[in-house]
């Protein structure tokens, strides 16, 4: 692993000073402090072993974050089961996490291990803005996803027609613009230690107005919106479940689950797979009588044809539905007089059967889509919950410091721990998708092991 080399590079940079010269050189300033004296030795706060250990842990976290989120992007863009327009939100969210791992975390690690900012004044402002931007974009993405879930639950048909890839992409652009507006202030008002400080530091604006406004805009307000939206989704889902259970009624005497009004078993709405109908439930009595009349005519025509051909098959068929279908196919193929007599009725039955199969297939697809939406909503609820758990300690302690300053300030090691726990969230979303979503799990396996299978075949 490259952690010893990284630790050595950090130690060399600390000894060399910022920007490759004296430790005191910063922006337009010189290589000494205001009094003209040298800065002295770098303020190293970790031993060489601790530097190597922390670099190894954070390096693994960075690699894991990048690889996991790249897999998410590839899975959504290549898997047929994940190609729904709303999954573009996950692509954008994964992209934000990749940018956190590549553009923010390495510099945060260097700043932590070296105990001062080595990379100059301009990059300090850019780094702070990117840090706030990517964190804010993550939670604004989750907020937009929660609204998407709410509309897909409460306005399923209308909203699904409107939710095109173009609309989703426009929403994603709006999410990034909102995040940029919230994160722009660090570019123009980042905080810098006074000249009397030992080494240059890079930190966010320390004024109370900025601390509170950034915490509210970047975390607390989106969290409130997500909480209210998901509470509403839960209420709607609970009401629908109660209504469906009342319509279905109790289970049959044999303990079997009741069949829905479209002839599909209950499993179709729960696990996303269409179960074959246990019984044929007709929409109304008149259409059922009409079908029985057609089947009777078909059987009579089939018997006449069988008598003409000398067939001695059994009169007991496998069931009215199957007998009708088989009779229709046989009659349509038969050139005999019995086939001609029953051709009109066989065509009508074949038309009815094909229409019923299409209707059943349509209902099946709708049930599968609803089950997928349900699972997707649950997975995203887990993603949002984990995000809040990871970032709440940092934002709460940071806003508390903005209100009452030193009286409420946490010990510095604990505050830094909360800070890095927030960064860890960027690596958790792929794990959540793998654990809770079968489509992602299957797609990840296909991506990771496809080449290995090809190698074995060759």
Swiss-Prot record:
It is found in: Cell membrane. The keyword Cell membrane applies. Glycans are attached at residues 19, 33. The chain crosses the membrane at residues 52-76, 89-114, 125-147, 169-191, 208-231, 380-403, 417-437. GO terms for biological process: adrenergic receptor signaling pathway; female pregnancy; G protein-coupled receptor signaling pathway; negative regulation of uterine smooth muscle contraction; platelet activation; positive regulation of MAPK cascade; positive regulation of neuron differentiation; positive regulation of vasoconstriction. Residues 291-303 have a biased composition (Basic residues). The gene is Adra2c. SMART domains: 7TM_GPCR_Srsx. It comes from the Eukaryota. Disulfide bonds join 124-202. InterPro entries: ADR_fam, ADRA2C_rcpt, GPCR_Rhodpsn, GPCR_Rhodpsn_7TM. Residues 245-343 are annotated as: Disordered. It comes from Rattus norvegicus (Rat). GO terms for molecular function: alpha-2A adrenergic receptor binding; alpha2-adrenergic receptor activity; epinephrine binding; G protein-coupled receptor activity; protein heterodimerization activity; protein homodimerization activity. Keywords: Cell membrane, Disulfide bond, G-protein coupled receptor, Glycoprotein, Membrane, Receptor, Transducer, Transmembrane, Transmembrane helix. GO terms for cellular component: axon; axon terminus; cytoplasm; glutamatergic synapse; neuronal cell body; plasma membrane; postsynaptic density membrane; postsynaptic membrane. The record marks 214, 218 as: Implicated in catechol agonist binding and receptor activation. This is Alpha-2C adrenergic receptor. Residues 1-51, 115-124, 192-207, 404-416 are extracellular.
């Amino acid at each position: 692993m490259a952690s010893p080399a990284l630790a050595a590079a950090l130690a060399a940079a600390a000894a060399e000073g910022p920007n490759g010269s004296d430790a005191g050189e910063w922006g337009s300033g010189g290589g000494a402090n205001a009094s003209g004296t040298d800065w002295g030795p770098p303020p190293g706060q970790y031993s060489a072993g601790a530097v190597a250990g922390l670099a190894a842990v954070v390096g693994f976290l960075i690699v894991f974050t990048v690889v996991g989120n790249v897999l998410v992007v590839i899975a959504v863009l290549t898997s047929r089961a994940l190609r729904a327009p709303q999954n573009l939100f996950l692509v954008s969210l994964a992209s934000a996490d990749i940018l956190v791992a590549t553009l923010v975390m390495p510099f945060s690690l260097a700043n932590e291990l070296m105990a001062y900012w080595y990379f100059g004044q301009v990059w300090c402002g850019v780094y702070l803005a990117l840090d706030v931007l990517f964190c804010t974009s993550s939670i604004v993405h989750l907020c937009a996803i929660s609204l998407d879930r709410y509309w897909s639950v409460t306005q399923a048909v209308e909203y699904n027609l409107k939710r095109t890839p173009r609309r989703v992409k426009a929403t994603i652009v709006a999410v990034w613009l909102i995040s940029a507006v919230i994160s722009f202030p660090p570019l123009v008002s980042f905080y810098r230690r006074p000249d009397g400080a030992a080494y240059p530091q890079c930190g966010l604006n320390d004024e109370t107005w900025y601390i509170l406004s950034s915490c509210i805009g970047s975390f607390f307000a989106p969290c409130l919106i997500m909480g209210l939206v998901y509470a509403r989704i839960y209420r709607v889902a609970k009401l629908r479940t109660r209504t469906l259970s009342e319509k279905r009624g109790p289970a049959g005497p044999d303990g079997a689950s009741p069949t829905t009004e479209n002839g599909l078993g209950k499993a179709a709405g729960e696990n996303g797979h269409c179960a074959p109908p246990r019984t044929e439930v007709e929409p109304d009595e008149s259409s059922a009588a009409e079908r029985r009349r057609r089947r009777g005519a078909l059987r009579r025509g089939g018997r006449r044809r069988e008598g003409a051909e000398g067939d001695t098959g059994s009169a007991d068929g496998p069931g009215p539905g199957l007998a009708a279908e088989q009779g229709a196919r046989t009659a349509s193929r038969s050139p005999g007089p019995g086939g001609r007599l029953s051709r009109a009725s066989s065509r009508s039955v074949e038309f009815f059967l094909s229409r019923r199969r299409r209707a059943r297939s349509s209902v099946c697809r709708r049930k599968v889509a609803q089950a997928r939406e349900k699972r997707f909503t649950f997975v995203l609820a887990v993603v949002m919950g984990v995000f809040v758990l990871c970032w709440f300690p940092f934002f709460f302690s940071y806003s508390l410091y903005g209100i009452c300053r030193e009286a409420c300030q946490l010990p510095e090691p604990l505050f830094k721990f909360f800070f890095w726990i927030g960064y860890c969230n960027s690596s958790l979303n792929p794990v959540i998708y793998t654990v809770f979503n079968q489509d992602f799990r299957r797609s990840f396996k296909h991506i990771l092991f496809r080449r290995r299978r090809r190698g074995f075949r060759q």
